[in-house]
Amino acid sequence: KRVVVTIHGIDWQREKWQSGLGSKFIHQGEKNAVKYADEVIVLSKGVQDYFKETYGRKTHFIPNGVNRPQTREANLITDKFGLKKDSYILFLGRLVPEKGIRYLVEAFKNVKTDKKLVIAGGSSDTDSFMKELKELAKGDDRILFTGFVQGQMLDELYSNAYIYTLPSDLE
């Protein structure tokens, strides 16, 4: 039988695995995947480059598909957050260090723009990183944290964003 492995990211580098043995076990699993899998699928060019440079391993880049959100006018997001079409840059995802949100906030604070930075999503493991982000964003009223969103609110955020950004370290 043939073995095909799909790699979603460089998981052993995630901050949540750095204490204890988790990182070592996951890293060993990565090495086993490289050694024993007949084919390796990766979801990003960055991970593809990592496997080529680290292991000399050829991989197949197949990004995840997405369900296109229903296009919606800015109603709920205008009422709740004062957002209008093309008035903001959107980050949406779990608020964890490896998503690169810290870099995003730091960079955005140095950009002269009338756009807002909307950070949508909930914390995954602890609230300490969320507190750190809010402290980092303090004093810049262009940066907005919505918390977890879904349904019509999610569709409106996607539909009306000027641009979407995902500054991830590992994905």
Model-identified regions with their sequence ranges:
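Membrane-proximal helix-turn-helix segments that form the acceptor-binding/catalytic region
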Residues: G22-V40
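Short alpha-helical donor nucleotide-sugar binding micro-motif in glycosyltransferases
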Residues: F148-V149, E156-A161
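Carbohydrate-associated surface elements
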Residues: G46, G65
